[in-house]
């Protein structure tokens, strides 16, 4: 609410909230799930007025994801993985407390910065919660986003196998060079608790 409230004047914000409670049929009685309902409400086009920021829905979704990670009861596993395993030869294991998002630079939006037109290229954001329980974000590029997606979608593949798929998709001829780049990225992800290591069934 804090960011959305800061980019809309008080009357417009109150009118939007009032329309949400008056017109939207919430499907949940749980307070922590109200932000998800608000995103659904905005996505339907209800309550929107001419002059509203074009990124309002994306901002609401981003703040909802922050809340989801902050309130999640998921925990980092204590066993069942190699914290220092080889991220290319073995099977990388992702933290359950991360999400890859793409849209406006909503993490930078404030009263002074409100982009009015879409970016020429998609902006990718990685939002995650570390072992210290703090939710953070980082901007990533499209190949990094795809690398994480491939690991998530192919839990039985080694890092090398995932990189091979990425190289084919990108039409990148030098797989070894891409593997070297990817290893640096994966090591950074492990340092940030986005990767917790490698599975025990691998090296």
Please tell me what each predicted stretch does:
Residues 74-101:
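Short, conserved active-site entrance elements at the starts or edges of catalytic domains
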Residues 1-83, 133, 138-203:
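Long, charge-rich, low-complexity alpha-helical segments
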Residues 91-153:
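Low-complexity, glycine/alanine/valine/leucine- and proline-rich hydrophobic stretches
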């Amino acid at each position: 609410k804090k960011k959305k409230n800061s980019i809309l004047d008080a009357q417009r914000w109150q009118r939007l909230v009032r329309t949400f409670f008056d017109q939207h049929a919430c499907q949940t009685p749980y307070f922590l799930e109200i932000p998800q309902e608000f995103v659904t409400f905005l996505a339907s086009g209800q309550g929107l007025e001419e002059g509203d920021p074009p990124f309002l829905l994306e901002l609401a979704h981003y703040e909802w994801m922050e809340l989801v990670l902050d309130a999640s009861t998921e925990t980092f596993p204590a066993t069942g993985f190699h914290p220092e395993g080889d991220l290319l030869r073995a099977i990388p294991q992702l933290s359950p407390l991360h999400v890859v998002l793409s849209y406006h630079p909503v993490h930078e939006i404030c009263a002074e910065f409100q982009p009015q037109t879409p970016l020429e290229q998609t902006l990718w954001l990685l939002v995650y919660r570390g072992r210290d329980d703090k939710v953070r974000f980082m901007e990533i590029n499209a190949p990094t986003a795809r690398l994480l997606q491939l690991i998530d979608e192919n839990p039985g593949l080694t890092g090398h196998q995932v990189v091979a798929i990425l190289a084919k998709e990108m039409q990148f001829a030098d797989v070894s060079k891409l593997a070297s780049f990817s290893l640096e990225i994966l090591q950074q992800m492990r340092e940030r608790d986005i990767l917790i290591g490698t599975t025990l069934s691998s090296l």
